[in-house]
Amino acid sequence: LNLGTAGVMYVGGITGVIGAFIYEQNATQMNTFLTILIPILSSILGSLVMGLIYSFLTVTLRANQNVTGLALTTFGVGFGNFFGGSLIKLTNSDVPSVTLTATSLAFKKSLPFASKLGWFGEIFLSYSFLAYVAIAIAIIVSFYFNRTRSGLNLRAVGENPATADAAGINVGKYKYISICLGSIIAGFGGLYYVMDYACGVWSNNAFGDRGWLAIALVIFAIWRPNLSIIGSILFGGLFIVHNYIPNLSMSDQELFKMTPYLVTIIVLIVISMLKKREFQPPLSLGLSYFREDR
């Protein structure tokens, strides 16, 4: 469980913003394909570096995973605020934010026929392509974990790395690859937040606690990617339900924003009471592997 996910999302978001900012400032004529591609590649690069840092510290140096993750989050937030503040100064804006309208419009394009399908198109087909990419990733990862040899090997590494190592599985390689790919996916989450949810506006500390919400979602989904689709819809609904309740004070709104975390705590209590193995996290979750202790 990478507690640095919030920081990785931050870095993925700001590096995507930097790529988009450079392109918007230098392009004489905006190309839709490049407008989307450059921020994505920038986000991949930034989040991949974060994944490599976490992998090196926790897999190679065997540092404490929880402490390393928290440090990575602190670093990621500071990195984002520093470079975000630098971009804000470059724009000479009167407000403390950077707005990338052209890039946001390219990312937010929905299917052209969605509006013609009534309520169905409005509910299911009116989102940007990254939303559907996220769903596809969850389905593919679920299939990979349960139906492929390498996916089963990865699960074995998470359950008992010593046994996996004895069976000839390269534990370090599997951990490095999975951490880096997971970081890239988290970076996409940060990019999606900025370009779609925030309409291309970057302001420091804008992510709030959404990175931690992603970590809570992993626990809620009981480490099953397919359940994370349902969980993300539920968490998203709980997080914004206060917008549809009239006459709520600011303090009451913050209480409603707590509900996803309360639900996660309830899920943890329930699965601990059930004591069924299929509902439990991987046995080696958060533990460093020392081959000489095998």
Model regions: which residues?
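Hydrophobic core segments of alpha-helical transmembrane domains in multi-pass membrane transport
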Residues: 13-19, 74-81, 131-143, 182-190, ...
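Cytosolic-side transmembrane-helix boundaries in multi-pass membrane proteins
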Residues: 159-162, 166, 171-173, 245-294
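Alpha-helical transmembrane segments within multi-pass membrane transporters and channels
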Residues: 29-77, 239
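Membrane-interface helix caps of multi-pass small-molecule transporters
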Residues: 18, 22, 49-52, 56-61, ...
